[in-house]
Amino acid sequence: IGANPDVANNVYFRLAAQTGKNMIPVYSNVVTVAVTPYTIDMSLGYILNADKAETGVTLYSAASDGQYLGFMGATAWYNFFMKEGDGTVWGNDGVTGTAFLMSSEESSWNFWFPGMGGCYYVDANTNKKAWSALYIPSLTLTGDVAGTMTFDRPNVKWTYAFSAAQAGNITFKVNGTGRLYDSSTGTDGSDSDANLGIE
């Protein structure tokens, strides 16, 4: 109706009444109702567990356009659902049963990760009704600091401890190779390597 969100908007209407199709309708006086529409925040996809309970984990849609991205720390075969800001709950397509295809129908199953626990970069696209998981088994540092980073799964963060001889600037590069899982690979058929390109 073209109303402004988060402020009261007057909506005007009249009621029509008639006792039969062959009768002329009688109209009420104009009635004014103040309606305050609100904007639904569609920027977050809330990760639910297999019982559809909140987990505190979210994916982010920068443009609020139905594409949710983010890192997740998952155990092997972890099961989950995703809920949008408008309450729509997404799971795996229960009709085809194909992994990584999405559905918001009652027949949907939970999503599930492949059989490796660790760090995943998740891309869930409700418009394409498909999601993917880029498994990141390890990250290494090269440059002024060199070594292998450790993934803290419960807190979803990579760390590397080192001692600096003095205050100042250092330059390093983070490197890693990921395994992409999507509807074309299933949960155990990934044969693709993806350079993460994190610098």
Regions found by a protein language model. Name each.
Residues 1-199:
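Insoluble glucan recognition modules
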